[in-house]
Curated annotation (Swiss-Prot):
Its cofactor is Mn(2+). It comes from Arabidopsis thaliana (Mouse-ear cress). Its EC number is 2.7.8.5. Its main location: membrane. It catalyses: a CDP-1,2-diacyl-sn-glycerol + sn-glycerol 3-phosphate = a 1,2-diacyl-sn-glycero-3-phospho-(1'-sn-glycero-3'-phosphate) + CMP + H(+). Catalyzes the committed step to the synthesis of the acidic phospholipids, including phosphatidylglycerol (PG). Together with PGPS1, required for the proper embryo development by providing PG accurate levels. Residues 1-23 are annotated as: Disordered. It is found in: Microsome membrane; Endoplasmic reticulum membrane. This is CDP-diacylglycerol--glycerol-3-phosphate 3-phosphatidyltransferase 2. It is a multi-pass membrane protein. Optimum pH is 8.5.
Length: 233
């Protein structure tokens, strides 16, 4: 899922605005570039709120059984994936990261991805050889959503402990690959509901299983790191 593996880091690394720097330049030291702004509404946050607002629209269009409904659903998901990257890019380049944005970004990603997975589970995919297979998307969906719930709990617990544990659950490359394959897989699966793209279904299913495998693998890696830290206490 669009997760904290990618999104939180993007929103986590920026200081206050230019005006505050000019006001305080003669009276106090400049803030660290790694300090988060306390502003609630910034451009990246607006984009993130847009992703949250798009979730019910995605659900509504998914059940519109005509070409424009399928097109709208796929387009909404693609737009969400693009803004997931864009809000982090803007936050880095324009130094608009905020505490609220750092909290909201992974929440928006999880909502969009989980909603899409659940929607796909409600309409069984039709495999060329096996016909309708109810569990084809359900199995990797359980793995992906279960992993995200587990990691959210683990990260919250680690944040309340010492710095070593927080470092143990920091972003790794597996999480980034998992997110990339997940977004591509879900885009393909949504698009393949249209007869023009149904030949892409096997590749979408395959990528979803790859994403589920990477999800479990990255969870194991995180748990091993945490275990090593706990053993050193």
């Amino acid at each position: 899922m669009g997760e904290e593996d990618t999104a939180t880091v993007d929103q986590n690394s920026f200081g206050g605005g230019k005006d505050s720097l000019l006001r305080n330049r003669h009276s106090s030291p400049l803030p660290s570039p790694t300090q988060l702004s306390s502003k609630v509404i910034t451009l990246p946050t607006v984009l993130t709120l847009g992703r949250v607002a798009a979730v019910p629209i995605l659900v509504a269009t998914f059940y519109v059984d005509c070409w424009w409904g399928r097109t709208a659903t796929t387009s909404i998901f693609i737009a969400a994936a693009i803004t997931d990257w864009l809000d982090g890019y803007i936050a880095r380049k324009m130094r608009l990261g905020s505490e609220f944005g750092a909290f909201l970004d992974p929440v928006a990603d999880k909502l969009m991805v989980a909603a899409t997975l659940i929607l796909l589970c409600t309409k069984p995919m039709v495999a060329v050889v096996l016909g309708p297979v109810p569990w084809l998307v359900t199995v990797p969906s359980i793995a992906i959503i279960g992993r995200e719930i587990t990691m959210s709990a683990v990260r919250e617990w680690a944040a309340s402990q010492n710095g070593k544990l927080s470092e143990a659950v920091a972003v790794n490359s597996l999480g980034k690959w998992k997110t990339a394959t997940q977004m591509i897989a879900l885009t393909i699966l949504l698009a393949s509901r249209d007869s023009s793209f149904e030949r892409l279904l096997p590749s979408g299913i395959g990528l979803l299983y790859v994403s589920a495998g990477l999800s479990i693998w990255s969870l194991v890696v995180y748990m091993r790191k945490i275990w090593r830290v706990l053993l050193k206490k």
